[in-house]
Amino acid sequence: MASLKNKHFMIGLSLTFIVALFSFLAAKLPILDKVGALTIAILIAILYRHFKGYPEQYSSGITFSSKYLLRFAIILYGLKLNIFDIIGQGSRLLAIDVGVVIFSIVMMLFVNKLLRGDKNIALLLGVGTGVCGAAAIAAVAPIFKSREKDTAISIGIIALIGTIFSLIYTAIYAIFSMTTNVYGAWSGVSLHEIAHVVLAGGFGGSDALKIALLGKLGRVFLLIPLTIVLILIMRFRSSESSSKGRISIPYFLIGFVIMALVNTYVTIPSVLLNILNTVSTICLLMAMVALGLNVAFKDLKNRALKPLMTIIITSICLSSLAFIVVHWLYS
């Protein structure tokens, strides 16, 4: 019996790995490189669920990917941060980033209330839009006690919208006159994922990409204080409602902070850093596959339309406001 359970666990884990690896490699191909590995992974998982059903007997391996590998990926994500660079070179951008995070969450909740959408998904999308997309959503989902299908829907939506917006940014840069500093800063402080920032910022050249990444990594850095604030808010609401549910600091966020400090104070060989970043990406993709397998088409039909409209409106407002502020500061 134990050997059968282990076999089913390995098959479930292997399923998420194979789809993740395929998505990772497919995203390097022309056209698909604009779509992104996250979007590809989630779409394949949802389509698999639709045509083949959820592989219940292999659920232990799939659940391992959606929980433990996801948390491990977030811990390694901290290696992208160098706190001295963000506070030093990116201090002006960091000030904008604070406004971006606050605006994204507040605007998302405001529009969601007008549309009468799902508040939990709106919160996840607000954090994802303001901070760093899928990784931020995955980091705060346990704090909000979100269901896996809501987390998957939120990640799928933000991956799709971020890809579309990054392509729109490149078109705007090609058509209109804009300095590399303005374009890079605008991309960094307003696009959803690091991959989206790299796609759009890289189109403006190496100088634009450098400032774009500084702007984006400042938002990733803000995940640390944001999660502390959210935990305190949830604890207050929990005690106010006499709830017995205890809100604790997720251990993987502590790991995220430790990795950020390690990358700041320790010189890590670039080869090792690249390997760890690839491992982080694969683990994150495996988690996305596992989360996507929990989403049925009826969930998308019933729960995704209003959040999709909400994030489009919020992203347009954020992009417009961010451009005005960046243009004023860098022109």
UniProtKB/Swiss-Prot annotation:
<keyword id="KW-1003">Cell membrane</keyword>
<feature type="transmembrane region" description="Helical">
    <location>
        <begin position="122"/>
        <end position="144"/>
    </location>
</feature>
<feature type="transmembrane region" description="Helical">
    <location>
        <begin position="69"/>
        <end position="88"/>
    </location>
</feature>
<protein>
    <recommendedName>
        <fullName>UPF0324 membrane protein SAR0338</fullName>
    </recommendedName>
</protein>
<comment type="similarity">
    <text>Belongs to the UPF0324 family.</text>
</comment>
<feature type="transmembrane region" description="Helical">
    <location>
        <begin position="183"/>
        <end position="202"/>
    </location>
</feature>
<feature type="transmembrane region" description="Helical">
    <location>
        <begin position="273"/>
        <end position="295"/>
    </location>
</feature>
<feature type="transmembrane region" description="Helical">
    <location>
        <begin position="247"/>
        <end position="269"/>
    </location>
</feature>
<keyword id="KW-0812">Transmembrane</keyword>
<feature type="transmembrane region" description="Helical">
    <location>
        <begin position="217"/>
        <end position="234"/>
    </location>
</feature>
<feature type="transmembrane region" description="Helical">
    <location>
        <begin position="308"/>
        <end position="330"/>
    </location>
</feature>
<feature type="transmembrane region" description="Helical">
    <location>
        <begin position="93"/>
        <end position="115"/>
    </location>
</feature>
<dbReference type="Pfam" id="PF03601">
    <property type="entry name" value="Cons_hypoth698"/>
</dbReference>
<dbReference type="InterPro" id="IPR018383">
    <property type="entry name" value="UPF0324_pro"/>
</dbReference>
<feature type="transmembrane region" description="Helical">
    <location>
        <begin position="9"/>
        <end position="26"/>
    </location>
</feature>
<feature type="transmembrane region" description="Helical">
    <location>
        <begin position="154"/>
        <end position="176"/>
    </location>
</feature>
<keyword id="KW-0472">Membrane</keyword>
<keyword id="KW-1133">Transmembrane helix</keyword>
<feature type="transmembrane region" description="Helical">
    <location>
        <begin position="31"/>
        <end position="48"/>
    </location>
</feature>
<dbReference type="GO" id="GO:0005886">
    <property type="term" value="C:plasma membrane"/>
</dbReference>
